Curated annotation (Swiss-Prot):
Cited InterPro entries: NadA, NadA_sf, Quinolinate_synth_type2
GO cellular component: cytosol
Family to which this protein belongs: Belongs to the quinolinate synthase family. Type 2 subfamily.
Function: Catalyzes the condensation of iminoaspartate with dihydroxyacetone phosphate to form quinolinate.
Positions that bind [4Fe-4S] cluster: C111, C196, C282
Record bears the keyword Cytoplasm: yes
Membrane-spanning segments: none
Pathway: Cofactor biosynthesis; NAD(+) biosynthesis; quinolinate from iminoaspartate: step 1/1
Protein name: Quinolinate synthase 1
GO molecular function, one term: metal ion binding
UniProtKB keywords: 4Fe-4S, Cytoplasm, Iron, Iron-sulfur, Metal-binding, Pyridine nucleotide biosynthesis, Transferase
NCBIfam families: nadA (TIGR00550), PRK09375.1-2 (NF006878), PRK09375.1-4 (NF006879)
Cofactor: [4Fe-4S] cluster
Length: 324
């Protein structure tokens, strides 16, 4: 991957709307160091949409939702990939790049969904529902993916379910994503009990209050939100779909019912749009910082490894998804 990296000084013009000067003065040393380290080490940084603007807009080479990062990870030709996101994303990057070094800056960057289910849980579901295909959300460990028939993201879940041509499908582990997909298809969806700790806190009452306070506001919801929230929203979709919606429709005022940094990152691209922010922070995503990205590149921390037997089966489930 080749690119001319701008200086950190010019980068501030891009993010000044969401990063005050006093904060920028704290970030700039790490940003300069990271830009230099990437060149020296032939490294790229993949950043999820929930990363803070100083990471997303200033040091990342590839950005996007889980599906976009999975697709783009396959095209990376650098020797080192730093995943600015949570652990399952780093594992997915490693699955798709087994011969590259994949680093995650903080091993504690987990996910409530990934922690809600184990490989043994999937095996028990298979015993309970024999011959029913298992669709596993990418927000899971490699061990869980290895027990699955195919993976999905919030951006392609409906297409994945339809691609199986089955009357019944097990969909793990996000209960609300499964219910929201079930509302769009005649396929019977058997759900698990996992929930995203960020999205489960949004309520339909939140939306009604927003509409009362901001008449005419456009409400966009993530499909990990409860079904009643999705029903109240003007649009529901993945973070990439939300970003595309804002770019296409240019609403005067909008609220994104998702993680806080998403609004900041989209606002950088659309200064003409007024973003209302009743968001929820993801404590796991916020464990990734400029400081630990810099340390990851300086000290080669933390290298992602996956058991080869698990990796082979998990890779198949992820790659099958990418061909849908």
């Amino acid at each position: 991957m080749s690119a001319v990296l701008p200086s950190s000084a010019s980068l501030y013009d891009r993010v000044r709307r969401v990063i005050p000067p006093i904060e920028w003065s704290v970030f700039v040393e790490d940003i300069d160091a990271i830009l230099n380290l990437k060149r020296q080490r032939n490294a790229v940084i993949l950043a999820h949409n929930y990363q803070t603007p100083e990471i997303f807009h200033c040091v990342a080479d590839i950005v996007g939702d889980s599906l976009a990062l999975a697709r783009k990870a396959m095209t990376v030709d650098a020797e080192i990939i730093v995943l600015a996101g949570v652990h399952f994303m780093a594992e997915t990057a490693k699955l798709l790049n087994p011969d590259k070094t994949v680093l995650i800056p903080d091993l504690g960057a987990g996910c409530s969904l990934a922690e809600s289910i184990t490989a043994e849980d999937v095996r028990l579901m298979r015993q309970r529902y024999p011959s029913v295909p298992v669709v596993t959300y990418v927000n899971t460990s490699a061990a869980v993916k290895a027990e699955s028939d195919i993976c999905c993201t919030s951006g392609n879940a409906l297409a994945v379910v339809k691609s199986l041509g089955a009357p019944r499908v097990i969909m793990l582990p996000d209960e609300y994503l499964a219910k929201n997909i079930a509302a769009q298809t005649k396929v019977e969806i058997i759900a698990w009990k996992g929930r995203c700790e960020v999205h489960e806190r949004f309520t339909a009452a939140d939306i009604r209050e927003l509409r009362e306070a901001h008449p005419g506001i456009s409400v966009l919801a993530h499909p990990e939100c409860p079904p009643e929230v999705v029903a109240e929203a003007d649009f529901a979709g993945s973070t990439a779909a939300m970003s595309d919606y804002v770019a296409r429709h240019r609403p005067a005022r909008v609220v994104l019912m998702t993680e806080c940094s998403m609004s900041d990152n989209v606002a950088v691209e659309h200064p003409e749009v007024d973003f209302v922010r009743p968001c929820n922070l993801c404590p796991h995503m916020k464990r990734i910082t400029l400081a630990n990205i810099r340390t990851a590149l300086e000290e080669n921390r933390h290298v992602v490894t996956i058991d080869p037997h698990v990796a082979e089966r998990a890779r198949w489930a992820v790659e099958r998804m990418l061909f849908v």
